């Protein structure tokens, strides 16, 4: 019985919701704002060299499309990611190579109705 209880707790921990970092990473690598927007909350804070504010999902998608048009991505790699102590939020830090420049990307995810959605994205030139 103790083994069953341990296995159940282990399975519950393993199946806890996680942000889809593979899909987010692939969308950033391709510069695909539409694919990335699937993981946006209804409002998202976007910070780049030219914008800084809270935007609707549609506005944020448009702003990122403009960014990816002027700075065509050629690759993205995650350098760090993890969960907050409360397990209700996650972060991801990565490097985007785009338009001949290197950018540091910070993404903050928050759990909303059982799914992790992007609440904040910062794109800063390295």
Set out the residue ranges of the language-model regions.
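Surface-exposed, charged secondary-structure patches
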Residues: 62-101
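Short beta-strand edge/turn micro-motifs at domain boundaries
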Residues: 102-126
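Short, aromatic-enriched amphipathic alpha-helices that serve as compact interaction elements
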Residues: 17-32
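Short, well-ordered alpha-helical segments enriched in acidic and aromatic residues
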Residues: 32-43
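Solvent-exposed, acidic/flexible segments
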Residues: 29, 53-57
